[in-house]
């Protein structure tokens, strides 16, 4: 007869009808009983030929691709002028007095952040924008390109101008001022940032001030001439609108106007008269930010031509005959002035050598499940988390549930602050730019790459004979619709661009570490500035707590002004006032303890409704199920041990079959959730100890002992002794000398025993007592006549490394008082 759910609960001692604990509980450690129960519940699944289930409700395998939904009406969010003050340490010290060593160390990490991977993998520009929406390729391209443009305008991205120069918008930092272009600034400026040069400045004078200089260019030219085939061109990059830098490129480029037969003559002309006043032909290359200067003798036929040769793919349609009713020339001829092919930033700096490549692709998704009107940029820098380019990210403290409850479970009134674009507050050093590159290859190459019928190949790109290969009804209709949204920016966005991050991106493992250090140090400063307030943060979630609503509002105003003075942007529309029950990190935290938020409880109920029985479920789907159930496991009777069969199947990468009894057991567990309470300090007067053959207790001055029917592993015996101590004394603070029992997870014990012990020892705190000082050591060895001196160890609840509470150093007396009315507390409130 299969084991029913009521019988199984009775076996686990979860009902009132259980017999004496000293007799019943050791049976649960028996290996044979655990094996028989597992077989009866079908928990040890042999290899079966039944097809696996790969989808349970909304849960799919971790590695299965869900179909993303594109919204053509996505709104690109606007970013404020985010500029975190560089002297943030001085500003904090003016506000609160001397900072602690830890606070200074954390703040120095982020001004400016460094990121130096070993060997990044560079990808072609074609992979800059991921084709996540095959039905909306062009629309997604322009929306993503517009998002990148907004980030660049907001000072969050650098724009690669040349191999060794970049431009950006916004306020410069001091380390950017030191990286000015060349030894001497082009214009006299105190900041040393290269401004836009005056119109009409000759190319010669600009080249003299180039960091490479004339001689180095000639040396490079002479060296590169040896062993190279094809033409060598003097390429002058536009670092500002009128200032140039000379570099050389070999024959591998795709835009070689000079024919092979004239390459020798062209090389000698460049070499002999590289910087003399010759007629030049300016031509924008496909990268959209380079100008190629071809030196041509004045008497040549080419110099007699009228006007420059148009290389802009977009503008070439103006001079071509329409190929059909859907030819792009109809669109291009709508405007006379399509604007520049490229834009330049307000400031220009030198950067390490940066290729015209990307290190990660980008695409757009909904901002969050509750906001589908706005888009969010997803950056895929996963190469830094896997393979040969993997980077070991620094670890940081994540608050566990008990520490969080100990710290925040109180009768305070709460509100939470929303930091606008929190990651984009933290600046990156320009030396990290070559490793964090995003961009696009331009519309023509992007469409050509995705079109299976396109005849465009690299060396033909942009020439007149294949110009109309792009023309199609779908492209024409898409561009006409986008023209209403972006106007003449369609031309700008159709050009290639390479961008590097100036602020930390979300797709790199270094970013959450830096953000956690930043917000935790800021909250530490706020806590010391306002002793009657509790400020706490995890990543970009900041919460403030105070005794009364009036006090909280006053502190909120002062803290907001302080954060704004540091350059931290808050979104006042998203400030939430929670009353006395704080919603934080998926929990509801009040004076009674912590519970999961309601939306998580609803997800669990939906999961059990759709959970199939007697059908093998893919272990990757089981990972998703365990992720949800594991979040709420501390609030159930049996906790994590109840999920151990699922953990075992995931570890073995085998399918798992839910038996009706096991599913009913889990469902009963999650129907009633018990709050995790705040631990209270107290005196430990109950001690437990065990040997493989017996157990002993010391309850005050009373001593007890007992023996096991058969020898048990020492950890199992120690756990049984702790359960007996809790059952006999009712004490919620127990002393033990076993480190495994001190752990709140009982997943390493026999399955049935772990489930029962989790319920018996719920809300029990443990104090470590060395064996030599443990009063229960003698009874466990059968010596009741010997009495050791009774210890009085004090239990102090831990808040882990997450509270980061620092006692305030002496504050200068001239600082004004922070709270100008009678404080609601007689003494400064401190975390427990």
UniProtKB/Swiss-Prot annotation:
InterPro entries: DNA/RNA_pol_sf, DNApol_viral_C, DNApol_viral_N, HBV_DPOL, Rev_trsase/Diguanyl_cyclase, RT_dom, Viral_Replic_Matur_Polypro. Keywords: DNA replication, DNA-binding, DNA-directed DNA polymerase, Endonuclease, Host-virus interaction, Hydrolase, Inhibition of host innate immune response by virus, Inhibition of host RLR pathway by virus, Magnesium, Metal-binding, Multifunctional enzyme, Nuclease, Nucleotidyltransferase, RNA-directed DNA polymerase, Transferase, Viral immunoevasion. GO terms for molecular function: DNA binding; DNA-directed DNA polymerase activity; metal ion binding; RNA-directed DNA polymerase activity; RNA-DNA hybrid ribonuclease activity. Gene3D superfamilies: 3.30.70.270. GO terms for biological process: DNA replication; symbiont-mediated suppression of host innate immune response. Activated by host HSP70 and HSP40 in vitro to be able to bind the epsilon loop of the pgRNA. Because deletion of the RNase H region renders the protein partly chaperone-independent, the chaperones may be needed indirectly to relieve occlusion of the RNA-binding site by this domain. Inhibited by several reverse-transcriptase inhibitors: Lamivudine, Adefovir and Entecavir. Its EC number is 2.7.7.7, 2.7.7.49, 3.1.26.4. It comes from the Viruses. It holds the Pfam family RVT_1. It catalyses: DNA(n) + a 2'-deoxyribonucleoside 5'-triphosphate = DNA(n+1) + diphosphate; Endonucleolytic cleavage to 5'-phosphomonoester. Residues 208-224 have a biased composition (Low complexity). Mg(2+) binds at residues 418, 540-541. Residues 336-679 are annotated as: Polymerase/reverse transcriptase domain (RT). Residues 346-589 form the Reverse transcriptase domain. Residues 1-177 are annotated as: Terminal protein domain (TP). Transmembrane segments: none annotated. Residues 178-335 are annotated as: Spacer. Residues 208-241 are annotated as: Disordered. The record marks 63 as: Priming of reverse-transcription by covalently linking the first nucleotide of the (-)DNA. PANTHER family: PEPTIDASE A2 DOMAIN-CONTAINING PROTEIN-RELATED, POL PROTEIN. Terminal protein domain (TP) is hepadnavirus-specific. Spacer domain is highly variable and separates the TP and RT domains. Polymerase/reverse-transcriptase domain (RT) and ribonuclease H domain (RH) are similar to retrovirus reverse transcriptase/RNase H. The polymerase/reverse transcriptase (RT) and ribonuclease H (RH) domains are structured in five subdomains: finger, palm, thumb, connection and RNase H. Within the palm subdomain, the 'primer grip' region is thought to be involved in the positioning of the primer terminus for accommodating the incoming nucleotide. The RH domain stabilizes the association of RT with primer-template. Hepadnaviral virions contain probably just one P protein molecule per particle. Belongs to the hepadnaviridae P protein family. Multifunctional enzyme that converts the viral RNA genome into dsDNA in viral cytoplasmic capsids. This enzyme displays a DNA polymerase activity that can copy either DNA or RNA templates, and a ribonuclease H (RNase H) activity that cleaves the RNA strand of RNA-DNA heteroduplexes in a partially processive 3'- to 5'-endonucleasic mode. Neo-synthesized pregenomic RNA (pgRNA) are encapsidated together with the P protein, and reverse-transcribed inside the nucleocapsid. This is Protein P. It comes from Gibbon hepatitis B virus subtype ayw3q (isolate Hope) (HBVgbn). The lineage of its organism: Viruses, Riboviria, Pararnavirae, Artverviricota, Revtraviricetes. The gene is P.
């Amino acid at each position: 007869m299969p084991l029913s759910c009521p019988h199984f609960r009775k076996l686990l001692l979860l009902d009132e009808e259980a017999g004496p604990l000293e007799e019943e509980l050791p049976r649960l450690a028996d290996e044979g009983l655990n094996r028989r129960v597992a077989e009866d519940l079908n928990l040890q699944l042999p290899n079966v030929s039944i097809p696996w289930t790969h989808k349970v409700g909304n849960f799919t395998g971790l590695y299965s691709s869900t179909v993303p939904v594109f919204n053509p009406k996505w709104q690109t969010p606007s970013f404020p002028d985010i500029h975190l003050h560089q002297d943030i340490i001085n500003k904090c010290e003016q506000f609160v007095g001397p900072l602690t060593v830890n606070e200074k160390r954390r703040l120095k990490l982020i001004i400016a952040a460094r990121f130096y991977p070993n060997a990044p993998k560079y990808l072609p520009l074609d992979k800059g924008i991921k084709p996540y929406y095959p039905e909306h390729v062009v629309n997604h391209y322009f929306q993503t390109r517009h998002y990148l443009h907004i980030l660049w305008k907001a000072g969050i991205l650098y724009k690669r101008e040349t191999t060794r120069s970049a431009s950006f918008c916004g306020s410069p930092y001091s380390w950017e001022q030191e990286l000015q272009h060349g030894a001497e600034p082009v214009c006299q400026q105190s900041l040393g940032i290269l401004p836009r040069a005056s119109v009409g400045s000759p190319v010669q004078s600009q080249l003299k001030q180039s960091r490479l200089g004339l001689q180095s260019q000639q040396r490079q030219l002479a060296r590169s001439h040896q062993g190279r085939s094809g033409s060598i061109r003097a390429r002058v990059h536009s670092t500002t609108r009128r200032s140039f830098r000379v570099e050389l490129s070999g024959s591998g480029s795709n835009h070689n106007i000079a024919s092979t037969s004239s390459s020798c003559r062209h090389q000698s002309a460049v070499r002999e008269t590289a910087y003399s006043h010759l007629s030049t032909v300016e031509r924008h290359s496909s990268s959209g930010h380079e100008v190629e200067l071809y030196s041509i003798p004045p008497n040549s036929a080419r110099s007699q031509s009228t006007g420059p040769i148009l290389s802009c793919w977009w503008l070439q349609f103006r001079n071509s005959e329409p190929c059909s009713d859907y030819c792009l020339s109809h669109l291009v001829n709508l405007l006379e002035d399509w604007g520049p092919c490229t834009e330049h930033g307000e400031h220009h700096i030198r950067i390490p050598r940066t290729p015209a490549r990307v290190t990660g692709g980008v695409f757009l998704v909904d901002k969050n499940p509750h906001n589908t009107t706005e888009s969010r940029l997803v950056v895929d820098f996963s190469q830094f988390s896997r393979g040969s380019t993997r980077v070991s990210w620094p670890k940081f403290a994540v608050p566990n549930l008990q520490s969080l409850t100990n710290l925040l479970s109180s009768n305070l009134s709460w509100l939470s602050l929303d930091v606008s674009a929190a990651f984009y507050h933290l600046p990156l050093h320009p030396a990290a730019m070559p490793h964090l590159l995003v961009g696009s290859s331009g519309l023509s190459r992007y469409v050509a790459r995705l079109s299976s019928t396109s005849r465009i190949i690299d060396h033909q790109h942009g020439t007149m004979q294949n110009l109309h290969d792009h023309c199609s009804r779908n492209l024409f209709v898409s561009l006409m619709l986008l023209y209403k949204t972006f106007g003449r920016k369609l031309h700008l966005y159709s050009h290639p661009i390479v961008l590097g991050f100036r602020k930390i991106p979300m797709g790199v493992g270094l970013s959450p570490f830096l953000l956690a250090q930043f917000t935790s140090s800021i909250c530490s400063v706020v806590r010391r500035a306002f002793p009657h307030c509790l400020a706490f943060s995890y990543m970009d979630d900041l919460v403030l707590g105070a005794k009364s609503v009036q006090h909280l509002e006053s502190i909120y105003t002062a803290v907001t002004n302080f954060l704004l003075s540091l350059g931290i942007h808050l979104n006042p529309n998203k400030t939430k006032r929670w009353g006395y029950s704080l919603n934080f990190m998926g929990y509801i935290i009040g004076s009674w303890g912590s519970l999961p938020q309601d939306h998580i409880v609803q997800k669990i109920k939906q999961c059990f409704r759709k959970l199939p029985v007697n059908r093998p479920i893919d272990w990757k789907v089981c990972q998703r199920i365990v992720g949800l159930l594991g979040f709420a496991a501390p609030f159930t009777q049996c906790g994590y041990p109840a999920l151990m069969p699922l953990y075992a199947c995931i570890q073995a990468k085998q399918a798992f079959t839910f038996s009706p009894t096991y599913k009913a057991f889990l469902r009963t567990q999650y129907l009633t959730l018990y709050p995790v309470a705040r631990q209270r300090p107290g005196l430990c007067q109950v001690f437990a100890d065990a040997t493989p053959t017996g157990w002993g207790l010391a309850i005050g001055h009373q001593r007890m002992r007992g023996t096991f029917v058969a020898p048990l592993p020492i950890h199992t015996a120690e756990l049984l002794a702790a359960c007996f101590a809790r059952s006999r004394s009712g004490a919620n603070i127990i002393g033990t000398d076993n480190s495994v029992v001190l752990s709140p997870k009982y997943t390493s014990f026999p399955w049935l025993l772990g489930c029962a012990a989790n319920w018996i020892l719920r809300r029990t705190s443990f104090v470590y007592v060395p064996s030599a000082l443990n009063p229960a050591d003698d009874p466990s060895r059968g010596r009741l006549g010997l009495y050791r001196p009774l210890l009085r160890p004090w239990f102090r609840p831990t808040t882990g490394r997450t509270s980061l509470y620092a006692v305030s150093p002496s504050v200068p007396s001239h600082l004004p008082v922070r709270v100008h009315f009678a404080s609601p507390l007689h003494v400064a409130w401190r975390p427990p």
